[in-house]
């Protein structure tokens, strides 16, 4: 039984690692990979002159990568360049989709999260919530709420379960806000470059 559990844990860790590698790789396929969790639009100048021969534009806190064939710019934050130098379990990347190079083209910005982060988070909340509900149902059927001490114990344990859910929610929200702030810092840095430099090929 222990061997089966160990094998399952190794498989899960392997799948999560593979998911993160696929999510952070410098490949055009990363454009549609992950769970889309945010969208916004803005009109900006887009020119290949801002990027090097490989399509890279180094930024103070990350990298912008131009993919002309996909009409997109990938934003990859570098967590080591921020004040809090650690990566959470909910990293984000972003992709800006455009129709053509222009002095004023509409950019569609999409934020994405790894599938494993979203699925494991949902699984954790469902497990805790499901376990709490199952406990309350079985406790009530066993007559646990029939007496005052039993009712007090049931309410206390239920409150503990709710605190666990609340703590998990706080962690997820705090981590998401941190990663979103990092991504938006890189987005603002790219935006500053696009707004500052005059286009050479389009003028």
Locate the predicted segments by residue.
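Cytosolic/matrix-facing juxtamembrane and C-terminal tails of multi-pass cellular membrane proteins
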Residues: 174-203
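Membrane-interface amphipathic/juxtamembrane segments adjacent to transmembrane helices
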Residues: 24-62
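Non-transmembrane, membrane-adjacent beta-strand/coil modules in membrane-associated proteins
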Residues: 54-99, 113
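Alpha-helical transmembrane spans
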Residues: 1-29, 113-185
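Juxtamembrane amphipathic/hinge helix adjacent to a transmembrane helix
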Residues: 96-108, 136-144, 196
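A membrane-cytosol interface segment of integral membrane proteins
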Residues: 36-50, 88-122
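Generic low-complexity segments that are intrinsically disordered, proline-rich and/or Lys/Arg-biased
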Residues: 49, 59-61, 69, 150, ...
């Amino acid at each position: 039984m222990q061997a089966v559990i160990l094998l399952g844990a190794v498989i899960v860790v392997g799948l999560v690692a593979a998911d993160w590698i696929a999510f952070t790789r410098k490949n055009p396929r990363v454009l549609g990979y992950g769970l889309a969790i945010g969208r916004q639009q803005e009109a900006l100048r887009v020119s290949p002159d801002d990027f090097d021969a490989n399509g890279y534009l180094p930024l103070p806190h990350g990298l912008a990568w131009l993919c002309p064939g996909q009409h997109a710019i990938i934003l990859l934050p570098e967590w080591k360049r921020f004040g809090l130098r650690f990566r959470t379990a909910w990293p984000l990347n972003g992709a800006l989709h455009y129709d053509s190079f222009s002095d004023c083209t509409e950019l569609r910005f999409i934020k994405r999260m790894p599938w494993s982060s979203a699925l494991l988070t949902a699984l954790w909340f469902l497990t805790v919530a499901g376990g709490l509900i199952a406990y309350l149902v079985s406790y009530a059927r066993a007559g646990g709420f029939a007496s005052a001490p039993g009712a007090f114990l049931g309410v206390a344990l239920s409150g503990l379960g709710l605190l666990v859910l609340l703590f998990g929610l706080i962690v997820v929200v705090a981590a998401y806000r941190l990663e979103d702030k990092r991504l938006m810092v890189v987005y603002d840095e790219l935006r500053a470059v696009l707004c500052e430099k005059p286009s050479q090929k389009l003028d």
